Each structure stands twice: as C-alpha cells, then as structure tokens.
Amino acid sequence: MMYFSCKEGKAVNVYDFDNTIYDGESGFDIFMFYLKKDPKEIAKLIPRFGEAFIRYKRGAIKTDEVIEQYGDMLTDYCVKIKDIHKDITEFWDEDEKKIKNFYAKIQAPDDVIVSACPEIILGEICKRIGVKNYIGSVVDMENGIIERVCYKENKIAAFKSIYGDMPIDSFY
C-alpha cells in the first residue's frame, strides 16, 4: 500500500469500500469465489462460518472475539492457498464490474479507501481504479495470522495510526 503525507490543512475524502464504492460485500464475494474454486474445502468451513456470523449479528460476540474464536479457520485455509496473487487477479477480473460508476466521476488523487477487506485483496482493485491510498485488514498469508482487523471502530483507529490528525473533508 502507499501512504501519503498531507499538506498542512489539506483535507481528504475517505471512503468505505463495501457497499459504498463496491456494490456488495467483498468479503462475502471472495468467500463465494473460493467456494466455487475449492468447494470441498470451503464447504467444511460453512457450519463454523455460519455460527460465527449468526453469533456476531445477534451481538453475542464482538469482532475481536470472532477473530479469537474462529480465526483458526482463516489461518488453516490461508496456508493452503498456492498462488494468492493469481487468485486475487482472477477474483477482480470477475468482480471489478461491481465498482460503482459514481466513484470515477468524483474520484480525487488523494482519496483514502478504508475497508475490512484484507489489503492484499484491496490493493489489486485500488491499483486498477487508480487509488493510491488505502487501509484494510492485514493478514500474513504465509501463516494465516490476522494482524489487523479494519472493521467498525477499528477503521478510525487504523486511519489515525497511519495519517494522524489529517483533516477529513468527507467520510463516505
């Protein structure tokens, strides 16, 4: 990823990715991509994935608890992926069409995209649409360890840890 230095007083626009710039939930779409690509392995994860999703949506567990209690699914699967960069390219070849048209009309060179989507996946689409500044979740693909979850309140913390008190013109 590429982070920039803001000129004194210059405000930036910050965009959430899923359901703002991207038509849908990229996490769900990447899950479906791997379900088609590797149905036997992904099918094994569906019961626990579903349980985690339901418990989270009902408010029974928080984001960090989801990672703590269910993160091993991601860890175990990530280490089995042979060529993540090839998969990401293939995924965006199929799903790039889900980038909403409005964004190209208002895009500015210093926009920042913030997403729960892992940076390894987010980076490819940002490169394709000309966005240099993005923050996402961080997953070490060699060992499957989740290093940063960029979700809900963590998005603000991630932004501040990278950009400090950079002024924000609009947050979409």
Regions found by a protein language model. Give the residues of each.
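Active-site neighborhood of HAD-like aspartate-dependent phosphohydrolases
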Residues: 2-58
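Charged/polar, solvent-exposed surface patches and flexible loops
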Residues: 29-36, 44, 48-51, 68-73, ...
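Short, compositionally biased "basic patch" segments
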Residues: 49-77, 126-134
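Generic structural signal for well-ordered secondary structure
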Residues: 23-27, 63, 67, 152
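C-terminal cap/substrate-recognition subdomain and adjoining C-terminal extension
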Residues: 2-12, 87-172
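Metal-dependent phosphoesterase signature
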Residues: 65-101
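A general boundary/transition motif marking the beginning of the first structured unit of a protein
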Residues: 18, 37, 58, 72-76, ...
